Curated annotation (Swiss-Prot):
Name assigned to this protein: Uncharacterized protein SERP0979
Keyword Nucleotide-binding in record: yes
Disulfide bonds: none
Domain of life: Bacteria
Organism: Staphylococcus epidermidis (strain ATCC 35984 / DSM 28319 / BCRC 17069 / CCUG 31568 / BM 3577 / RP62A)
Length: 263
């Protein structure tokens, strides 16, 4: 169960995601890194009262990471036997839970076609390791997330993308962001929160102009910044949570300039 829920001034984002979920449609959440896509998936899991099994994609993702693997175990009689340990895809299918595939476009294109039957009307998979045919139990749903244009991402296969309905998830701002900061961080100082929100607006503008990376303007970075601002000067909090993560000196300087303007 999540302690906090997804919030957005555009209420249709969550409403539409919930409606698609109830129609058993595959949902693809598309938006910048740190915009709350995983929080939206967690909130759906909470609202629908269904556990969520997560796959974190990378170029190293393989079939075993998705489906599971064979291993040797000792049974009750003390004999060793080969057993198959279900991975997140098969667990979610068998138990009628949610499968959440994070950063799906980080995976190599040749890794994902094995999910085609899972993602279409069949909701079915043949386990290549055991030959077992698995049909998804009622309640099974698929949510995936994509960070377009992010370093390391690959163009998403059109046949795969066509199996999803896309929902754009943008950064939150204004009063909604203020509420999120107060609920999810230790910072309660109204004036400082307003300064942080204005600072974040400047970061987002620089992100859109290509001056800094998306991660610098992410909601999770903002929550960390707000927490640290309760125990150290705001300038040092920004240094620790945002600037020190960046390698490019020009990006670092751009954020230092934004600090001078806002604090």
């Amino acid at each position: 169960m999540v302690q906090t829920v997804y919030k957005n001034s555009d209420q249709t984002v969550f409403e539409d995601a919930k409606a698609l979920f109830q129609l058993n449609k595959n949902i693809l959440l598309k938006g910048p890194t740190g915009s709350g896509k995983t929080k939206l998936a967690e909130t759906l899991s909470h609202v629908m009262n269904l556990p969520m099994h997560q796959v974190n994609c990378s170029v190293d993702l393989d079939t075993e990471s998705l489906l599971g693997f064979k291993t040797i175990q000792t049974n009750e009689e003390g004999h060793q036997e080969i057993v198959f340990i279900d991975g997140p895809v098969i667990k979610a299918m068998k138990e009628g839970h949610i499968l959440y595939i994070d950063e799906i476009n980080m995976a190599k294109p040749e890794t994902l076609p094995i999910l085609n039957g899972v993602l279409d009307y069949r909701r079915q998979l043949t386990n290549p390791y055991t030959g077992e045919v698995i049909k998804a139990a009622p309640g099974f749903n698929v949510i995936a997330a994509i960070n377009e244009g992010y370093v390391g991402t690959l163009p998403m296969n059109e046949a795969l993308k066509n199996r999803f309905i896309v929902i754009e998830v943008d950064y939150i701002d204004g009063d909604i962001l203020k509420t999120v900061i107060k609920e999810q961080s230790k910072l309660q100082d109204e004036q400082l929160i307003q300064h942080i929100i204005k600072f974040n607006e400047d970061l987002r503008t620089m992100t859109k102009q290509g001056q800094i990376s998306e991660e610098a303007a992410s909601i999770r970075a903002l929550i960390d910044l707000s927490d640290l601002a309760t125990v150290m000067p705001i300038e040092r909090a920004v240094q620790r949570t945002i600037i020190d993560k960046l390698e490019d000196e020009r990006e670092q300087q751009a954020i230092l300039n934004a600090i001078e303007l806002n604090f």
